[in-house]
């Protein structure tokens, strides 16, 4: 098996899509092929891969607006968390493992930013596609304190589940680099540094604009 991995800038709000594939099996999964689904499909084809799945990390429009066109071009099913607003053809539950040739894509439910969010984790390849759950140096926004509390629990779940050497590939290019590692995020991401208690985490969420200004962050 030869692992195929591509990060693709698709436009929108600095969105990333991804192509994951097994070259020997000739199959690929497209992750969040929004804004420019044609380009994402073509990248899979250029690698000699047939698209078997279209996976949404979550149901926000900026991650799903390419679904219809990607499905039209590939006839692949939409995969998302059960009950997702993305209305998946193939709904999954927490911990479902999607088989893609010899690749195993573990889908980890991480509600908070939105209830249907999942992280796509490939343990053998040391890769996690974190969508809007975890960015480089930041995390996804929340609309309510209840959602922020849920997000805190989900972040702890990821901290417990993903080892330090896992590469983090986010859904947007919001950080100082397009990818990171769990070790680097634990050491530098302000929100992960505030995971000592939920109160500390919530305080940073509330004061994030001030914190950014004081630290000169964008």
Where in the sequence are the language-model features?
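Short, polar loop motifs at secondary-structure junctions
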Residues: 78-86
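Catalytic core of the metallo-beta-lactamase
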Residues: 1-51, 86-165, 170, 176
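Active-site metal-binding motif and surrounding structural segment of the metallo-beta-lactamase
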Residues: 37-79
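Intrinsic-disorder/low-complexity, polar/charged segments
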Residues: 61, 144-145, 197
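Glycine-rich, phosphate-binding/catalytic loops in enzymes
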Residues: 47, 71-73, 146-147, 185-188, ...
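A generic "cationic amphipathic patch" detector
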Residues: 33, 53, 57, 67, ...
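Accessory terminal helices/loops
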Residues: 153-218
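Asparagine-centered polar/low-complexity signal
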Residues: 15-16, 56, 67, 189-191
């Amino acid at each position: 098996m030869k692992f195929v991995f591509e990060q693709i800038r698709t436009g929108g709000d600095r969105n990333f899509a991804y192509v994951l594939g097994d070259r020997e099996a000739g199959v690929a999964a497209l992750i969040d092929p929004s804004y420019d689904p044609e380009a994402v499909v073509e990248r899979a084809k250029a690698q000699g891969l047939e698209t078997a799945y279209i996976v949404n990390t979550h149901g926000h429009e900026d991650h799903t607006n390419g679904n219809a066109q990607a499905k039209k071009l590939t006839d692949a099913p939409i995969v998302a968390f059960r009950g997702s607003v993305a209305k998946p053809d193939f709904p999954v539950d927490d911990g479902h493992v999607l088989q893609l040739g010899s690749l195993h894509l573990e889908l980890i439910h991480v509600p908070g930013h939105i209830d249907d969010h999942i992280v796509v984790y490939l343990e053998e390849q040391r890769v996690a596609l974190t969508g809007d759950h975890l960015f480089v140096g930041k995390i996804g926004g929340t609309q309510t304190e209840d959602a922020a509390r849920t997000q805190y629990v989900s972040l702890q779940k990821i901290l417990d589940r993903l080892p330090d050497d896992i590469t983090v590939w986010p859904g947007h290019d919001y950080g100082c680099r397009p990818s990171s590692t769990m070790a680097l995020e634990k050491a530098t991401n302000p929100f992960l540094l505030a995971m000592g208690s939920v109160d500390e985490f919530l305080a940073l969420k509330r004061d994030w604009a001030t914190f950014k200004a004081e630290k000169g962050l964008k």
